[in-house]
């Protein structure tokens, strides 16, 4: 991570005093965080801590009751999720959620609804650069893939729109450590090659401090640096 990596020395994403939740009930309280271009930030916490809600607030799929979310120095609180996608934010949800009856290729295309048909092949090749096995299996039904390969499809689908910010929800869930290594290595390469920012939500037991630039902890709806929690 470097402040100069985006030329302007300005964070890609800023959250200031954000409150968000469901059906009028707040789950997040005065959340403050920033993400710089080209860095990986891991957001860790237990079940029900608010990790998923925070990613969805950034993506625009839950209600934001207060505070401000800024992306590329634009206030996006009122933007619909599809507008955020067009602006460069992409989401890989928990549980991978691939379309089991569709091929790998078709699953990837599902992440490229705003991409001209003439560009789909090139976009797929971009994905295969980081996940070569998907290129060899692009005509295979996603439901027949291993859990690790399905996770690669989910992240690849998020890459198809060529985002500047990728939100990844619990990519380690249910995967062997060696597979998790490959997934994180691919995310690191994507950050370096494309100056993409990545925010990963993980459980505490899946925390990989050495594979990211910063760790933030979410507890009872608020976010604190991992280092400050470790000192308490």
Predicted regions and their residues:
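ABC-type ATPase nucleotide-binding domains, specifically the catalytic core motifs of the NBD
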Residues: 23, 64, 104-122, 130-135, ...
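Helix-to-loop junction immediately C-terminal to a conserved catalytic motif
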Residues: 59
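ABC ATPase C-loop
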Residues: 158-159
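Conserved ABC transporter NBD signature motif
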Residues: 67-75, 87, 120-122, 225
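The feature captures the beta-strand-to-loop junction immediately N-terminal to the Walker
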Residues: 44-46
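H-loop/switch region of ABC-family ATPase nucleotide-binding domains
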Residues: 201-203
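Conserved ABC ATPase signature
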Residues: 141-145, 149
């Amino acid at each position: 991570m470097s402040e100069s990596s985006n030329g302007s020395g300005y964070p890609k994403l800023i959250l200031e005093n954000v409150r968000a939740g469901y059906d009028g009930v707040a789950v997040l309280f005065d959340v403050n965080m920033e993400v710089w271009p080209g860095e990986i930030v891991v957001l860790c916490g237990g079940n029900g801590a608010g990790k998923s809600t925070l990613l969805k607030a950034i993506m625009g799929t839950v209600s934001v009751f207060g505070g401000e979310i800024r992306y590329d120095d634009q206030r996006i609180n009122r933007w619909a999720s599809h507008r955020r996608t067009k602006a460069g934010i992409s989401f890989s949800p928990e549980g991978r959620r691939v379309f089991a009856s569709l091929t790998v290729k078709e699953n990837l295309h599902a992440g490229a609804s705003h991409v001209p048909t003439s560009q789909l092949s090139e976009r797929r090749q971009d994905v295969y650069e980081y996940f070569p096995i998907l290129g060899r299996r692009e005509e295979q039904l996603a439901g027949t893939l291993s859990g690790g390969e399905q996770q690669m499809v989910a992240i690849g689908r998020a890459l198809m729109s060529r985002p500047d910010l990728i939100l990844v929800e619990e990519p380690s869930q249910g995967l062997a450590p060696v597979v998790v290594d490959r997934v994180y290595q691919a995310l690191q390469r994507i950050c370096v090659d494309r100056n993409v920012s990545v925010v990963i939500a993980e459980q505490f037991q899946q925390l990989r401090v050495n594979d990211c630039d910063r760790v933030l902890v979410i507890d009872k709806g608020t976010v604190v640096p991992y280092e400050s929690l470790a000192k308490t």
